[in-house]
Amino acid sequence: KGVLSTMDIMIRQKEARVIFNETEPLYVWADEFKTEEVVTNYVSNALHHLDGEKIVEIKVQKQENRVKVTVFNTGTPIPEADLPNLWNKFYKVDKARTREYGGSGIGLSIVKAIMEGMNQQYGVQNFDNGVEFWFTLDRK
């Protein structure tokens, strides 16, 4: 929720519709600041690659012994050939588009380093109408 309030200006500039249905508090084993960095990265990327209905949907789902956080945005799916390289430092799928907003290509490599440092899972999934990035955290 804090990430969304810090990004409020960007959300309004992009005319995005952000959907975040709060659930009951979930307690996890994680570094608060590093987790916030991952969410910020995912939401920022979602806003930069927003298209179509301009929807960004954030979900926090309770699983058996984990919590799964997903950030979905409407837009063009990422080409399958690019998916394995997304987590590499300085990798950019669409260089021209990234130049428009000044992206450096290091955001997802930071996500990778944080999640691997916490021994957690992370990933991306294409849908017909957009892309979803996700990560998991162990529950307390």
Sequence positions of predicted segments:
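A residue-level detector for a conserved hydrophobic packing site
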Residues: 35-36
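Conserved catalytic submotifs in the C-terminal HATPase_c
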Residues: 12, 17-26
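Short conserved segment of the HATPase_c
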Residues: 78-92
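Short helix-loop "hinge" at the ATP-lid/N-box region of the Bergerat-fold HATPase_c
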Residues: 46-47
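Conserved glycine-rich
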Residues: 52, 119-120
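Short beta-strand/loop element within the Bergerat-fold HATPase_c
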Residues: 53-65
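Short alpha-helical Gxxx[C/S/T] motif in the catalytic ATP-binding
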Residues: 102, 107, 111
